[in-house]
């Protein structure tokens, strides 16, 4: 009986190899042959999963985005009794990729962003990842506003636009801090301070007692 191949698992394994190589030499330097060698599979196995290098890179971008999003959701689910404010703090911690164990992932993500700026095909999965995170931020900000006292800024968030604006601002800040830490302009601790200060301002505008966004 022929051996059954788990193509989902193989595609993820190949995506991990793509990420390692993209970290070492940038996405533009990744070849299907090198990926096969790094993933310890044949070139034919890679080609059966992905018809072209572009298709392989697209999947790798989606893979990284899904990994970050899943980690954010898992962090939130780990504390079901936590407030929306606490959950948002945990979410921003994960998205910023400031911890040392996420440094390689941060480099890979920014390498794909840089490549997407000159190669439109990679832009769509990146936009999808950012959209999913923005939607999550909108939901948590709206829930946090609802938990605050009635009237004032909190009421404005019930209509949606302000929550979207705040979510966009927070996502842009969180994402931008990743690059500042990678190039050494800020330390991870300094970046966390910037993020916590912004969240404190958000809680003040909402009239919500928010915790510091620490993991």
Question: Which residue stretches match the model-derived regions?
Answer:
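Helix-turn-helix
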Residues: 13, 17-59
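Secondary-structure edge/capping motif, primarily at the C-terminal ends of alpha-helices
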Residues: 79, 113-116, 181-185
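Hydrophobic alpha-helical connector segments
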Residues: 73-106, 153-160, 166-170
């Amino acid at each position: 009986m022929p051996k059954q191949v788990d193509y989902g698992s193989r595609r993820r394994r190949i995506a991990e190899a793509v990420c390692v190589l993209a970290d070492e030499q940038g996405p533009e330097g990744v070849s299907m042959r090198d990926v096969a060698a790094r993933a310890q599979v044949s070139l034919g196995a890679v080609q059966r999963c992905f018809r072209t290098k572009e298709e392989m890179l697209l999947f790798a971008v989606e893979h990284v985005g899904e990994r970050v999003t899943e980690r954010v959701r898992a962090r939130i689910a780990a504390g079901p009794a936590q407030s929306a404010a606490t959950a948002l703090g945990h979410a921003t911690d994960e998205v910023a990729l400031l911890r040392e164990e996420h440094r390689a992932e941060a480099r890979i993500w920014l390498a794909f962003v840089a490549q997407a700026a000159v190669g439109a095909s990679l832009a769509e999965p990146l936009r999808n990842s950012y959209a999913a995170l923005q939607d999550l931020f909108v939901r948590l900000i709206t829930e946090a506003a609802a938990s605050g006292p009635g009237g004032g800024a909190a009421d404005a968030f019930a209509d949606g636009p302000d929550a979207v604006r705040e979510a966009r601002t927070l996502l842009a800040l969180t994402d931008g801090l990743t690059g500042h830490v990678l190039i050494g302009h800020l330390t991870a601790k300094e970046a966390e301070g910037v993020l916590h200060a912004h969240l404190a301002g958000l809680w003040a505008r909402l009239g919500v007692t928010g915790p510091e966004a620490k993991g």
